[in-house]
């Protein structure tokens, strides 16, 4: 999704996925479109960031950026719920991206590791 593209509809998968949001007067169809057109940057995919990222993706944010410079360690797994045992040793940004895409394939994920700069 390019930042210049604005969506004005939900596809059938999104309508089913966000059915509860669509029935809420506080969100509704227009609100869900606004979420789809929104971008969020999360600095850190650790303790707090790991939970926030999952909720943002589940809510329907269209584009999420993740910045982190750390690798997944076994000791992270009890509190950083976005990461899994099979991602130990991977960059947290890659682990988080993989998990978010499983949760919501409609969400665009952009990553930046400060290690590579």
Labelled PLM ranges:
Residues 1-115:
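Adenine nucleotide-associated cytosolic modules
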């Amino acid at each position: 999704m390019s930042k210049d593209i604005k969506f004005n509809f939900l596809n059938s998968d999104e309508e089913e996925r966000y059915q509860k949001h669509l029935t809420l007067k506080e969100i509704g169809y227009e609100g869900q479109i606004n979420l789809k057109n929104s971008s969020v940057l999360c600095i850190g995919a650790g303790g707090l960031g790991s939970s926030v990222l999952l909720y943002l993706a589940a809510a329907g944010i269209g584009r999420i950026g993740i910045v982190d410079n750390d690798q997944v360690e076994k000791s992270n797994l009890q509190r950083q719920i976005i990461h899994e045992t099979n991602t130990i040793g991977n960059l947290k940004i890659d682990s988080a991206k993989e998990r978010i895409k499983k949760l919501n394939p409609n969400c665009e994920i952009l990553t930046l590791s400060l290690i590579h700069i």
